[in-house]
C-alpha cells in the first residue's frame, strides 16, 4: 500500500563460423526455456501480510511473525486454488509488485519491505533489506535462500531471459541488480537513482528498464548492458504524484503508471499516465482519470488491455470524508497506435491491492486486503465481469505476482 511520508520511525497512518554457433546456442536456450516453462505449473504468488491492519478507526500495526506467501495454482483459470503457503516476511508497505516468478516458472522472488519495531504499546515500521528466493519446482515449494538487497525493497522485475532481476529500494533510493542462475540469486550492484524507488519494469528487449520514483512524481529510465545498469536521470519523465504501479506492454511500445496522489484514499481522483516507451526519449502522451488511489496495474499477455486496482476510499478511517467501503477494478484498452482508453469497471472488495492477469489473459485476479479474498473477473473484448468466485485466503493479500 502506498505510504506518503514514510520516515522509518513514523507509525503507519493510512493507507546473436561464431555467429552461427551463438545463434544455435540461443535457439537451444529458447527451446529449453520454453519447454521448462511449458512444464512448470501455472502458479501465481500472493503475499499475505499479518502485521498491518485497516481498522474502522484507522491503520494499525502489530508484531512480526504472522506473514506468509501463498502459492496459487491457476490451471483452472476461473477457479484458482491455494496449494501451499510459506511463512515468510512480506508487507503491504511494499507495493503490490514486490514479488514475481521467473519466466521458466522455477523461482519465486519475494521482497520483505519492512519489519515492525515495538515502542511501548505501538508498533513502528522499519525498513527491511531482504529478498526471499523460493524453489517452486520443489515438492512442496521451499525457501532456498534469503538475499540482502537495498533498504525497503519494493517492486521487483525479472527480464525475459530469466537471468537478471531488478529490485526497487524505496528507503534506499536505489535499484539493486541481481543475477539468476538455476536456483542461485546473487546481488551484482545497487544503483543510486536519486529518489525513492517504488516499482521497476523491464522493456522487452532487456536493454532498458523504468523505475517509479514515488515521491518525486517521476518515471526514471535505466539503461542496461549485460549486468551493467545506469540511471539516465536526464530522461526522467513527469507522471503523477505518488507514482506506485508500473507496467510495460509486451511489445515495449507503451508504459503505464498508477499515480496514487499526495495521500491515499483522500477522496480525490487520481490518474494513470500513458508513456510512449520505445523511443530514444520516452515521453508522456496522456493522463487518464481513474478514481481515488490506483494502487496497482497489470497488462494482459497480448498487450491489448490493462487492469487497474483502485482502492478508492477503502483504506481511510471510516469517519473520514473520503471513506468508501469498497474499491474497484478498471479495465483499459490499449490500441496498436498506443492510445489507451478506460472501457469498463467492476466493483471489488475492501482495500484492493495486487492485480494480475491469468496466463491466457481471459481472467483478472485482484487481492481484497481487508476481506482476505482473491476476486476473479472475466475479460471478453472490452468487457469486465465479476464472476462472483472468491478464493478465501489465510491472510491479507498485499501483493500478487506471476511470470
Where are these predicted regions, by residue range?
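Positively charged n-region of N-terminal signal peptides that target proteins for export
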Residues: 3, 16-19
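Short, positively charged and aromatic/hydrophobic N-terminal segments
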Residues: 11-12
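Bacterial N-terminal signal peptides
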Residues: 25-34
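Predominantly soluble domains enriched in secretory-pathway, periplasmic, or organellar proteins
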Residues: 37-403
